[in-house]
Swiss-Prot record:
InterPro entries the record matches: Caspase-like_dom_sf, Metacaspase, Pept_C14_caspase
Annotated active site: 222, 278
Domain of life, source organism: Eukaryota
Organism expressing this protein natively: Kluyveromyces lactis (strain ATCC 8585 / CBS 2359 / DSM 70799 / NBRC 1267 / NRRL Y-1140 / WM37) (Yeast)
Lineage, uppermost ranks: Eukaryota, Fungi, Dikarya, Ascomycota, Saccharomycotina
Name of the protein this chain belongs to: Metacaspase-1
Family per similarity comment: Belongs to the peptidase C14B family.
Biased composition (Low complexity): 9-44
One Pfam family per UniProt: Peptidase_C14
Known function: Involved in cell death (apoptosis).
Gene: MCA1
Keywords per UniProt: Apoptosis, Hydrolase, Protease, Thiol protease, Zymogen
GO BP field: apoptotic process; proteolysis
UniProt biased composition (Polar residues): 45-55, 83-109
């Protein structure tokens, strides 16, 4: 039984069997969520291309996620493979150790493993960070929300999370008991992707993480934007994701996700995040964004920041709250322009992290992402591209992975996957998961 496919137990009482279910044996809280909005829904059998499971339809929120600039959330045709073909691809590549992908793929150039020693950046190389070797414990949080019954219902998000579960456990050695899935086809109250459950699961993901651990976060669902309040977004808008109960509990803002999943991490801890949602280019507020040529797209955020900015960055990296608050006061005084607008590029320096955080997102901040379907197997286009590229060619550099995902999508979609990082990276390093 996959996580999230537990027997219906949601009757406004505490879940009786949560302790014995996958993903909850490793410190994940089994307490009843603070906010409950659903009662036991009717069950309806739905058959997929190679599997059959029960969708539990939840009453929709009072309002759908906001309409995007392009109108209704698009569901164009796409070439996602069937479940059985996908599994065979993984097994064949895993067994054969295939390195080279299809002839049209970009092959990694001088790919090598990340260094184990501490790295330095910033003025006079005073700010330290560390790559993860991904040899420690592996944990994953997979969230897929279809928003059943709403005006902007999606069809592939839950499939995305199950496909990702198969991929992580079959190809990369993640253990089922170290994976938590939140889907809106379950009646287990602790597995419904409400805002409270999502925030709690994010905290579980990063709790007690140690150097060389590998954490994986996957979100497939609706994304949007709201007004930026801290000056860290170039377009003046914060990116958000939508829990199933967003109308009553609100959305989750990128600043909060950064504070929960990035800020607490030690140097040498890897967090790989994959967002298959609209307007997700900077959804984790990571300061470095890379182009398909392997160069930083943004100006150097350390330039002309001065001593106050450096002190703030170092305080952030070491968790020194008192020093951080003091330094930030000087930073904001320094970087406020004559027209009282904040220099956003300089504000970004407080988002630096000494941990090894990598994010692939399905689109730029001003783009939508596609929900695709073929032969009854629905999927998000970005999730499909990520799984397809790595199953065809398991050994990739960061640069070749980004290039090949874009190549997979370019013939059918306008969205452009993005690569963002918590620190500068050598994009020719081998991508580890």
């Amino acid at each position: 039984m996959y996580p999230g496919r537990a027997k219906p137990t949601y009757n406004n009482q505490q879940a009786q069997q949560a302790q014995s279910q996958v993903g909850y044996q490793t410190g994940y809280s089994n307490a009843q969520p603070q906010q409950q909005y659903y009662t036991a829904p009717q069950q309806q059998n739905v058959s997929g291309s190679s599997m059959s499971f029960q969708h539990q339809f939840y009453p929709p929120p009072n309002q759908s996620p906001p309409q995007y600039n392009t109108g209704q959330y698009a569901r164009p045709a796409a070439p996602p493979p069937g479940q059985q073909n996908y599994r065979n691809d993984i097994q064949q590549n895993h067994a054969s150790g295939t390195v080279n992908g299809p002839s049209g793929y970009q092959q990694p150039q001088a790919m090598y493993k990340p260094p184990s020693q501490v790295q330095h950046t910033g003025p006079n190389n005073q700010v330290a960070y560390q790559y993860s070797q991904c040899t420690g414990r592996r944990k994953a949080l997979l969230i897929g929300i279809n928003y059943f019954g709403s005006a902007n219902e999606l069809r592939g998000c839950i499939n995305d999370s199950h496909n990702m579960f198969n991929f992580l456990t079959q190809r990369y050695g993640y253990k089922a008991e170290d994976i938590v899935m939140l889907n809106d086809d379950t009646t287990d109250p602790v597995r419904v992707p409400t805002k409270a459950n999502m925030l709690r699961a994010m905290q579980w993901l990063v709790k007690d993480a140690r150097p060389n651990d590998a954490l994986f976060f996957h979100y497939s669902g609706h994304g949007g934007q709201t007004e930026d309040l801290d000056g860290d977004e170039e377009d003046g808008m914060d990116d958000v994701i939508y829990p199933v109960d967003f109308q009553m509990a609100g959305h989750i803002v990128d600043d909060d996700m950064h504070a929960i999943m990035v800020s607490p991490l030690q140097p040498g801890v890897r967090l790989t995040a994959l967002f298959d949602s609209c307007h997700s280019g900077t959804v984790l507020d990571l300061p470095y964004t890379y182009s398909t040529k392997g160069v930083i797209k943004e100006p150097n955020m350390w330039k002309d920041v001065g001593s106050s900015g450096l002190q703030a960055a170092m305080a952030y990296a070491t968790g020194n709250t008192t020093s951080l608050v003091s330094s930030l006061g000087n930073v904001f005084t320094t970087i406020t322009k004559s027209n009282n607008n904040v220099d956003r590029e300089r504000v970004k320096q407080i988002k630096f992290s000494p941990a090894d955080v990598i994010m692939f997102s399905g689109s730029k901040d001003n783009q939508t992402s596609a929900d695709a379907t073929e032969n009854g197997q629905n999927t998000g286009a970005m999730s499909w591209a990520f799984l397809t590229v790595l199953s065809k060619q398991p050994q990739q550099s960061y640069l070749s992975l980004l290039q090949n995902m874009r190549a997979e999508l370019s013939s059918k979609y306008t969205q452009k996957p993005q690569l963002s990082c918590s620190h500068e990276i050598d994009t020719n390093l081998q991508f580890l998961l």
